[in-house]
Every structure is written in C-alpha cells, then in structure tokens.
Amino acid sequence: MNLISIPAFQDNYIWLLDNQQGHCIIVDPGEAQPVLETLDRLNLTPDAIVLTHHHHDHVGGVAQIVARYSGLKVYGPQETADKGANHIVHDGETIEINGQKFATIAVPGHTLGHVAFYSAPYLFCGDTIFSAGCGRLFEGTAEQMFNSFQQLAQLPDNTLICCAHEYTLSNLKFARAILPKDRHIETYQQQVEALRAKGQSSVPTTLQLERKINLFLRCHDTDLQRELGFHTPPEHLHSVFSELRLRKDNF
C-alpha cells in the first residue's frame, strides 16, 4: 500500500490509500478539486470514500467526487448520512474495501458520532488524535475523548496516526509550555520546525512517538499531573485530560 496525503484548505490533509494496482480509498475529502487532480495525475480509480465525522472540512468534496465516479461507496457514521454516506458503519464493525479490511472504532469527543478506521498499520482518526495533541470538544465531553484516546492507545506501537490537520508545531509549543524540560518534546519540536521550514508534512506520526510527546496520552505521568496542579494522584485520570484540554483551549 502507498499512503498519500493531499493538502487542502489551510491545514487539512485528505488521505488516499493506494493499493499500487490503480485503485485507492479516499479518506475525509473536505474538498473535491485537489482529490480529483491527484487521481488524474496518478491514474487512480477510487473504490470508496470513508468519512470519520460530519464536519464540512471532512465531507465537503463528497458530492462532486461521487458525481464523477457514479456508484462509489461512501462509508461513514450515522452523523454523515446527510453528508453523502451511503453505507453507515458502527462501532466494532469490520468493512472490506477491495480486499482491505478496516476495523471501525467509535471515538466520541470531537463529535458524538466520530469514528476511526484501522487497517494495520494505518489509523485514520480524523480530528481525534493529532500529533502531540487532541481534537477540540465540539460535541462530546473530556471524559469521552479520554476514553477514546485510551481505546486507540491499545493499538500497536507501529500504528501510523493519519490525522486530518497539520497542528503539530502549535501542539508542541503548548506541550513545551506545560513541560519545558521534557527532552522528548524539545527534540521533536526542533525536528518538526525543520520539516515545516522545508514545507514538509509532520504526519503521519506513530503511536510509539505519540506516547512520548503527546501529553494527552500521558495523563498517568506524575510529573505532568504535578504541573497541572494535581498534588495527589487524581481519582480519575480523565480529570487530568480535562485540565489539559481546558488549558489548550486557552493557550
């Protein structure tokens, strides 16, 4: 398989998973034109579109792509039924697209119906986990998002986090503000600054790396807890997550 990221809008990524036999899967096409141009340039035919949630910057290109590729299957959660999804997926369901199997994982938080799609090693997680960060809570609660993170954290270390935005540098600046002496975060920030200076993407990232530099995956870390004002171990780790999200919202 060949993973292709297509920049869209200001900081979005639309993903293509190319089977290297002329066919591909499109993930979260917020706009159609860059997708259609890429399909033409690489001579690819889409087998399906998969949608993680209902926000416009993830679904806005569906209608135009389907208009060109008549009969195209569009997989997504119930909240995308009015955004072009014609195959509704549910938590725990496995879908198969041209021989490629994807596990559907419910990850409420950013939206209530948000799902992720996992086909080792690829995790298409929309606006749930970002590199060094997490999605805003537009509909769900911090506890829901914490539980979603815990579920995704059970995946293997080599999992490729294919998130939908280039937020890494701003997330790392926030992490440095919370834990200024953390060497993993400091080193990775320098690496990402170098990448971005050359116009290169910082994603996908790996779950192994995120365990080190993503504070939202480190709620058990006693140093982090102390920095957030938890002087005794919290009764519930989701309260650490909630405090982190609140601080990020106001950063």
From Swiss-Prot:
Any one GO molecular-function label of the UniProt entry: hydroxyacylglutathione hydrolase activity
Pathway: Secondary metabolite metabolism; methylglyoxal degradation; (R)-lactate from methylglyoxal: step 2/2
Segments crossing the lipid bilayer: none
Record SMART domains: Lactamase_B (SM00849)
Chain positions recorded as Zn(2+) 1 binding sites: 53, 55, 110, 127
InterPro entries xrefs: Clx_II_MBL, Glyoxalase_II_hydrolase, HAGH_C, Hydroxyacylglutathione_Hdrlase, Metallo-B-lactamas, RibonucZ/Hydroxyglut_hydro
Keyword list, A-Z: Hydrolase, Metal-binding, Zinc
EC number: 3.1.2.6
Reaction catalyzed: an S-(2-hydroxyacyl)glutathione + H2O = a 2-hydroxy carboxylate + glutathione + H(+)
Cofactor(s), by name: Zn(2+)
The keyword Hydrolase is annotated on this UniProt entry: yes
One Pfam family named in its UniProt record: HAGH_C
PANTHER family: HYDROXYACYLGLUTATHIONE HYDROLASE (PTHR43705), HYDROXYACYLGLUTATHIONE HYDROLASE GLOB (PTHR43705:SF1)
Subunit description: Monomer.
Name listed for the protein in its UniProt record: Hydroxyacylglutathione hydrolase
